[in-house]
């Protein structure tokens, strides 16, 4: 119902959205609620954001179909009850599956007085087709770089707008645009929890997203989402005769393959396969995420790839798999043809060089 563009990135949106939930409970003198439920398949930023607002995190396991284990969730809700501030959930989730129990899940949380937070990381799969509010979510953040075509990477600037149901609008950060008769006014609600960024955040990033939405329109947005789902299912089907899929059936905009058997039989890891892809001039997919899938490769072709590009990628995946079986030792050396081969990623993480240093 209402939004703010102040948050400067997706994770910043999570933090800001959780502050919104916290302000709501505080206004009701219900500050005993200090626990957030997060599925074990969640993005790592979810528990990190909850911790930053001094919430304790309760992890709920996934069931064999990749969705939230509804019985485990019921047990947590029965035990914690009035301690629950809310639940954070991505839907479709990080294994690319739309949770069939989503209405039951959000109702369980609402019935004990908690709020439901929608991580918009996978909104690309449902935009124009389904609304988080209709699923029972009270707060949502959007990743403009993931869903609305704003620049991705390069150090920013970014934008992670948050939206909420009408009953939460008075807690939103900063000033809100309110229509009064024939003019608009800027209003700062008394219960607003403060500011998280100057003015309206990285406003030019928001304008780029607006240009994308206005260019595509309702039909174009829906088509982009449909193509993302179609492309993912096409690639999943074509690769399923070679790779082990983490979960069977129709996926949404992405799917996850498990290379655990390849690792066991030939000592070729998901990292080896990803590095080998660089020799073919193709960007490797996300590795080792979600953590609930061992030796995971997450494939998300997106809505922009045509069939020819996907067929080429499928061919490369299969060639690499064949190499892994016939010559596993060389897989540990790849890439062989790049300017820089295997970087010392541990050193880069522990001792990052974040600015130019003259010799």
Regions of interest found by a model, annotated:
Residues 1-2, 141-145, 189-192:
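Glycine/charged-rich beta-loop-alpha catalytic/anionic-binding loops adjacent to active sites
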Residues 7-12, 151-158, 196-203, 222, ...:
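Short, conserved micro-motifs enriched in small and acidic residues
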Residues 19, 26, 130, 183-196, ...:
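Non-catalytic terminal extensions of PLP-dependent enzymes
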Residues 2-4, 58, 87, 117-118, ...:
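Acidic/polar loop patches that form or flank catalytic/metal-binding clefts of enzymes
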Residues 12-180, 268, 295:
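Conserved PLP-enzyme active-site core in the AAT-like
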Residues 5-7, 62, 89-92, 257-259, ...:
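Short glycine-centered, acidic/aromatic-flanked micro-motifs in structured strand/loop junctions
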Residues 1-17:
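Short loop-beta-helix segment that forms the pyridoxal 5′-phosphate
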